[in-house]
Swiss-Prot record:
The keyword Disulfide bond does not apply. Gene3D superfamilies: 3.30.70.60. Binds together with bS18 to 16S ribosomal RNA. The lineage of its organism: Bacteria, Pseudomonadati, Pseudomonadota, Betaproteobacteria, Burkholderiales. Residues 96-124 are annotated as: Disordered. Belongs to the bacterial ribosomal protein bS6 family. This is Small ribosomal subunit protein bS6. Residues 114-124 have a biased composition (Low complexity). Keywords: Ribonucleoprotein, Ribosomal protein, RNA-binding, rRNA-binding. It comes from Burkholderia mallei (strain ATCC 23344). One of its GO terms (biological process) is translation. The gene is rpsF. GO terms for cellular component: cytosolic small ribosomal subunit. GO terms for molecular function: small ribosomal subunit rRNA binding; structural constituent of ribosome.
């Protein structure tokens, strides 16, 4: 089996459906004997360019190990899901299990928001 990194972008109006979508894709992978090494929900982020007149979208990254038939099934699911605006599947040499640079940035932003919220709570 080969290792892949999958990133897909979901319509921002469908953000609440993302956990269910992730579970559906994870069950597809594991039911065919594949493995999931990393799943990262990057949240709603600014797009580099407008897609379908949208400036923001919900990003999800998955690192998996599966065979070609499972990958074909996933790609088919991405193509025919109207909520998925774009998807990218990249073949990797080995499994990536650590946090991605994008996830580190998301964690940094959340830490800044938490630090900014604490002084206002202390003043109240």
């Amino acid at each position: 089996m080969r290792h892949y990194e999958i990133v897909f972008i979901v319509h921002p109006d469908q953000s609440e459906q993302v956990p269910a979508m992730i579970e559906r894709y994870k069950s597809t992978i594991t039911s065919h004997g594949g493995q999931i090494h990393r799943v990262e929900d990057w949240g709603r982020r600014q797009l580099a360019y407008m897609i379908e007149k949208l400036a923001k979208a919900h990003y999800v990254c998955m690192n998996i190990e599966c065979d070609q038939t499972t990958l074909d099934e996933l790609e088919h699911a991405f193509k025919f899901n109207d909520a998925v605006l774009r998807h990218l599947i990249v073949k990797m040499k080995k499994a990536e299990t650590g946090p991605s640079p994008m996830m580190k940035e998301v964690q940094r932003e959340e830490a800044k928001k938490a630090a900014a919220a604490q002084p206002t709570e202390a003043q109240a």
